């Protein structure tokens, strides 16, 4: 590291192996984002979206799934949600909107359920029963009913996953103890009155099903993506596709030979998709804890890092990991949450970098896993469930506020953090005389005047907190807060002097503000001395 003022590496993703002196990097509630041609830097830290409450109605029960249907009353798509044992439908959403409730109850379990629709019925698989409701029924006529499923080999079918492809619904069989590697398919365009998974005319009803061809793995996940069915077990996956007879009831699907691998999933709820990408937390006879991305018919690509896999291995509940994917401003994100460990890690397809997201309990001051679950795009909003009282919220770039994990209210500032890479110079002693943050300043929103009629500019005074480590991140020294500019103060500089010394120098910046801002880099003035 030469002397004088220089730009040093700072922006990046999370990568923190056990040996901290190698790298202690963490990026929390920031997204490393590529810039355009001739920009001042190639990569910046952009803010993750804020959160706001989209509907004040409270279910009082945990959400088990959300789904944006293909149609509804008057041909308009709707939002559906399963909360506890009840199913609700929103034809619009807003502050004081109350959803319509289906008659009947989902009587099995309290965990996640799987939802799909075929344009006629909404289908819900809860691990025991397949439930359906008419998509187009009026609010007062919404009624749940159970589908009579045929037995397979003399035992009842217990579906935990449902998907839709080629005008058919497809389900697995998660009957405990059976461990069956079969999936059943329905008739074409089944309604609440006609939906069937049995061969027409058979008595007793004989199931329409296929057995997995590549492995005897029980089927734990089914993903319909780009006209293909991805069938995933604990130690393998394979791909099926609609065949020449997909418009008849005889033999609608073909196994895609060669599109298989001995990589399955150790966490069925981690399976997620976006565009042509399918993700999951992988498991096989050879090992566990790697995250894979599969695109089309290609072989799966490991996208997790060694540091992340070590972190996953430390979890005692990795099999309960939850995954979902969503797109935002040119990014495609795969989010993987380990609730018991208070951890959410996010892979960005555009940069191939990982970052972290967290939500804070402002009563205890503890940061935990990111709250959002079950994201859907509906009503022109990116909706999700993530409150403690069952309210629907949305992700938005209009605010930097986030949901308080203690109260469920979206009224707290986002807590953002970046721990940069280790700065070192062949083990020489490095003394940092001055440190400046290259960041967006002066964009603090205007506040309401403290005195009515007062026209004096009034805005909050946002601050950045600096911590430094001279030993690679093992011990830290807190330095004072610095302002990064009231509203309109675009020339504000954010810098510290006499920041300390070390042979492995690490910088950590923290922010707790309720508006979005961007960080571009770090400049330091440093001196070197001999070993």
What positions do the PLM features span?
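Generic detector of low-complexity/intrinsically disordered segments
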Residues: 45-47, 81, 89, 132, ...
